[in-house]
Amino acid sequence: MRNRPPLTHEHSDTGEDISMSSWVYGDPAPPILRAYVGDPAKIRLIHGGVKETHVFHLHNPQWRLERDNPNSTIIDSISISPQECYTLDILHGAGSLNGTIGDVIFHCHLYPHFHEGMWTLWRIYDRLEDGTGRQP
């Protein structure tokens, strides 16, 4: 293994899944949301722009289209136009129903926007972080 080329130089590992990897390239520049699995969670989306509509997509967690309607459609993406805002009450809290831990990506679903940096992570922990930043 010592003479094995680095992971990013292998032909089979040159796709988007590696180019977005915090393990290989460090965390993305935008702020990373952090929570513990099961924490109650709300995300406030505010589009302060004046030109383009975006499609906010959160992988894994879901919320109700109409917050106060228990019969409302459950979704994981929403279009947001200039000067709009939404509060997403995440069902079952951080980690969602299945208790997902680790990094959950959220991004604009319009690929040029995603590719140009309109994405970040929601990091969900399963154990207490002491703030030192050390990896196990």
Task: Label the predicted regions.
Residues M1-P136:
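Copper-binding active sites and cupredoxin-like electron-transfer domains
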